[in-house]
């Protein structure tokens, strides 16, 4: 019987390519020992990471960053990110330090921001000196143009591109030490940096080319030829009854990789060829002509792209049979099988490959203790020791560039986690410049002359979203849940987290930092404790995460849970420790879901009023603090505490005072 409580007064392919293999994560080999991969950067210890981090971003000198200075500087860092200011290297602090971020300091550094500089003109020029092979040039050009438009939309600044000479903002990609005295650090970690307005390097923006640059949702593949020339691959796509999440040579005898540019190739028949050096090259002096294999360079014959003769690690080829004679060359485009990092300079995966005597047909994490998936770039890793990481979602060049161009305009890092100018990278699908960003840039340059000057009550484009403050505002939370032992409060794209009720939660933090791919606003959330998976509801879909990884195949429609089609939104959900069943509330009804059988229990839905006496319809959240013996029902600014065994209501109280430490 459900609880009755008193609420009180209240308101078929031939081979599977790298990206698909990474997702499937299947390997033939047995577990292997952990090894040292050549060219891999060993992870730093927590202490090493902290000293370097605080030196780079908070000015703690390496030579004198001893225990006492370290503790004091740590408190500054923790304050900046809204963490408890303990001065200790606790788990939350280390997690924050390990997140990918901008290379500019959080405490103003003279070389980056001397005396709050700004441009003394509104017409700013930019020049793109180099390109990443991860994206075609048109996509890179568009990402940079859109990133600059983010700032011109809200200021009088206007940006124009030049192709020769010295521009105000010189844009380039580089690896490690790249000529400005501020080296990058390989894959992940530091993503980019930019200099404040000024002469020389002032305004220049540099991007780490050891990263995988995308638009934030995996590799961006623009096709050539076929019947969809210039369009983008649609992943996954359907061909012969099977979904493909990467380019494939299935159905072809020439070995060329292709993809569909719509989901259903069988229906639409739209396709193109994926980037490959046999189709075209980039840059160089050969006007895009394809590689010519074999080609001769310095007396040696090459049958594939090479990095020989270069110090920047970029793969190139001759476009005639004799480079020594003709001097014609181009850079090899990245394919949908290209690796990232490692020691193969972006060479593609080769399957199957041999590793420690075992054969692997797909990307694997064997040999590693960090869970990262990799592949060999020759048939035998044991002999050749050539490898690279398999592609992931990558980093949005548009978002990172928009952040860096904010620095190039004179903005420093923001402590507002919802701001574009916050130092940690977080992918946001439907990006909007925040109120904090707009206020900062307009303090330097003023508003755009094109802005709507209407003083009416309606929203204007320059206001931007404001990061909420839980103790200063009356916030109605979208969801509340205990996940991995922590209590999370959700509101729009922000979360606050705490271990114990009444303690003021840490935050706000961005939801996307913990659970990428979620929409900006959820309706409900709960943890399935049996599997330690977090389940989120938004609209007529739901998402399932293991830690921060979205389970394959999600989001799924609510109907796949057993909810009827007329349920288009869920109000609240929780797993009740009393019977290990999950309860899902929508409007005036609720359902009971069996996590073991993966289906709804018979006899539901039931009316909330018939089973949960005096609990109102349209709840905001329900939480069972596992092990605590109580469940909590939230609506508006108040909550009810229910004793699980006796089913008695034992407390009615304020969320602000009892849960938020206000």
From Swiss-Prot:
Region called Disordered, residue ranges: 446-465
Fibronectin type-II domain boundaries: 228-276, 286-334, 344-392
Active site location: 404
Residues spanning the signal sequence: 1-29
Required for inhibitor TIMP2 binding: annotated span: 414-662
Cofactor requirement: Ca(2+); Zn(2+)
One cellular-component annotation, GO: extracellular matrix
Glycan attachment residues as annotated in the record: 575, 644
Pfam families according to UniProt: fn2, Hemopexin, Peptidase_M10
Family the UniProt entry places it in: Belongs to the peptidase M10A family.
Protein name, as recorded: 72 kDa type IV collagenase
Organism the protein comes from: Mus musculus (Mouse)
Gene that produces this protein: Mmp2
């Amino acid at each position: 019987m459900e609880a009755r409580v008193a609420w009180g007064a209240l308101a078929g392919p031939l081979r599977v390519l790298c990206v698909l293999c990474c997702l499937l994560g299947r390997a033939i080999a047995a577990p292997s020992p952990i090894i040292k991969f050549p060219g891999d950067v060993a992870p730093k210890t927590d202490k090493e990471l902290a000293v370097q981090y605080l030196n780079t971003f908070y000015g703690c000198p390496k030579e004198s960053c001893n225990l006492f200075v370290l503790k004091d500087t740590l408190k500054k860092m923790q304050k900046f990110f809204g963490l408890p200011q303990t001065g200790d290297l606790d788990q939350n602090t280390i997690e924050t330090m390990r997140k990918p971020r901008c290379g500019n300091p959080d405490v103003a550094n003279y070389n980056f921001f001397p005396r709050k500089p700004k441009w003394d003109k509104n017409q700013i020029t930019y020049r793109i000196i180099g390109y990443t092979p991860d994206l075609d040039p048109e996509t890179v050009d568009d990402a940079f143009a859109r990133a600059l438009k983010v700032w011109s939309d809200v200021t009088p600044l206007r940006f124009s591109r030049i192709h020769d000479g010295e521009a105000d903002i010189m844009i380039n990609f580089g690896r490690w030490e790249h000529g400005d005295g501020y080296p990058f650090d390989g894959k992940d970690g530091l993503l980019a940096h930019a200099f404040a307005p000024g002469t020389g390097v002032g305004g220049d923006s540099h991007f780490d080319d050891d990263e995988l640059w995308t638009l934030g949702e995996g590799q961006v593949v623009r096709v050539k030829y076929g019947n969809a020339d210039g369009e983008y691959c649609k992943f996954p796509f359907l061909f012969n009854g099977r979904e493909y999440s990467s380019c494939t040579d299935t159905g072809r005898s020439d070995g060329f990789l292709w993809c569909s540019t719509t989901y259903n190739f069988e229906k639409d028949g739209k396709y193109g060829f994926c980037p490959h050096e046999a189709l075209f090259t980039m840059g160089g002096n050969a006007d895009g002509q394809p590689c010519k294999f074999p080609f001769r360079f310095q007396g040696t014959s090459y049958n594939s792209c090479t990095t020989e003769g270069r110090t920047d690690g970029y793969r190139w080829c001759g476009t005639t049979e004799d480079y020594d004679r003709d001097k014609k060359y181009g850079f090899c485009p990245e394919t949908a099988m290209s690796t990232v990092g490692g020691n193969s300079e972006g060479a593609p995966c080769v399957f199957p490959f041999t590793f420690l005597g075992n054969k692997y047909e797909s990307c694997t994490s064997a040999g590693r203790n960090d869970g990262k998936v990799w592949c060999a770039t020759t048939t035998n890793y044991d002999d050749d020791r050539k490898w690279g990481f398999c592609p992931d979602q990558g980093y949005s060049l548009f978002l990172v560039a928009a952040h860096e161009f904010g620095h190039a305009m004179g903005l420093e890092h923001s402590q507002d986690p919802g701001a574009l100018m916050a130092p940690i990278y977080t992918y946001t699908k439907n990006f909007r410049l925040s109120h904090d960003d707009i206020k900062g840039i307009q303090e330097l340059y003023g508003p755009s002359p094109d802005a709507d000057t209407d003083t009416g009550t309606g929203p204007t484009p320059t206001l931007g979203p404001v990061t909420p403050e839980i103790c200063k505002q009356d916030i109605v939370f979208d969801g509340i849940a205990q996940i991995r032992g922590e209590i999370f409060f959700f509101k729009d794209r922000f979360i606050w987290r705490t271990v114990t009720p009444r303690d003021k939660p840490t935050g706000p933090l961005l939801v996307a930092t913990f659970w990428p791919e979620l929409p900006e606003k959820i309706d409900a959330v709960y943890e399935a404790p049996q599997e330690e998976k977090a389940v989120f509801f938004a609209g007529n879909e739901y998402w399932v995460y293991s830690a921060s990884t979205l389970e394959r195949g999600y989001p799924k429609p609510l109907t796949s849970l057993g909810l009827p089609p007329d349920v288009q939104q869920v109000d609240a959900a929780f797993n009740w420790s009393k019977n290990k069943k999950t309860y899902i509330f929508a409007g005036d009804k609720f359902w009971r879901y069996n996590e073991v059988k993966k289906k709804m229990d018979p006899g539901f839905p039931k009316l909330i009023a018939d089973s949960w006496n005096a609990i109102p319809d349209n709840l905001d959240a329900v939480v069972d603090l596992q092990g605590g013996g109580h469940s909590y029902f939230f609506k508006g600014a108040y909550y009810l505490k229910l004793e699980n065994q006796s089913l008695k209501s034992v407390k009615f109280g304020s969320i602000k005072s009892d849960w938020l430490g206000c």
